[in-house]
């Protein structure tokens, strides 16, 4: 049973970055925009998060850098897709390939300059919730995750509420159904 608990725990732990990407992509999907650049946003966010966290030693600044990088990539995608009326598939693929190439190039420059990124241990940031930890089966699965994991679970409910219970959500869905 501990083996199965470990698999489910790791699945939840590793699904969080993809879940956050999907939660952001829901807005584009509901507005009838096919955002192929989500992979590039994830890569830019993770690259700048690690880079800024390493440079400053502050993981919160790393999270903010990831958000900022994703916002910039999203603005580039929106500019070329909406303002310039470009093909969103081609723009998304171009962004994905460009971000991949730029991140690889910068990492090669850092390696040639003997700049090594030290990674922090994610186990240092895990939170054990006493109420959940003592539940026989669910305790080992749901307790001991990082803050961002619990935030992503809350974001699922908040985004559902925003999309289906607010005027903003109605506007986004109406624009997606009838441009």
Language-model features, listed with the residues they occupy:
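Single transmembrane alpha-helix segments in multi-pass membrane proteins
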Residues: 6-55, 63-64, 68-89
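Transmembrane helix-loop junctions in multipass membrane proteins, especially transporters and channels
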Residues: 26-33, 58, 82, 86, ...
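Membrane-interface starts of transmembrane alpha-helices
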Residues: 57-65, 87-91, 95, 147-151
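Short, strongly hydrophobic alpha-helical membrane anchors
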Residues: 1-8, 128, 134
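Membrane-helix/interface signature in polytopic inner-membrane proteins
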Residues: 158-179
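Small-residue-rich segments of transmembrane alpha-helices in multi-pass membrane proteins
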Residues: 45-47, 94-103
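Transmembrane helix-bundle core of multi-pass membrane transporters
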Residues: 100-164
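Transmembrane alpha-helical core residues of multi-pass small-molecule transporters
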Residues: 69, 95-99, 155
């Amino acid at each position: 049973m501990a083996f199965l608990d470990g698999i489910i725990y790791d699945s939840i732990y590793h699904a969080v970055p993809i879940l956050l990407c999907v939660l952001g992509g829901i807005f584009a999907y509901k507005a009838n925009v096919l955002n192929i650049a989500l992979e590039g946003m994830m890569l830019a966010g993770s690259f700048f998060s690690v880079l800024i966290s390493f440079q400053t030693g502050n993981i919160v600044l790393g999270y903010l850098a990831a958000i900022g990088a994703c916002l910039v990539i999203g603005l580039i995608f929106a500019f070329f897709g909406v303002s310039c009326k470009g093909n969103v598939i081609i723009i998304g693929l171009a962004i994905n390939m460009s971000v991949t190439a730029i991140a690889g190039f910068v990492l090669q420059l850092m390696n040639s300059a003997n700049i090594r990124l030290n990674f922090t241990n994610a186990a240092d940031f895990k939170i054990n919730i006493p109420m959940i930890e003592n539940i026989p089966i669910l305790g080992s699965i749901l307790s001991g995750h990082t803050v961002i994991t619990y935030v992503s679970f809350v974001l699922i409910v908040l985004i559902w509420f925003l999309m289906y219970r607010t005027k903003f959500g109605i506007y986004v869905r109406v624009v997606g159904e009838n441009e």
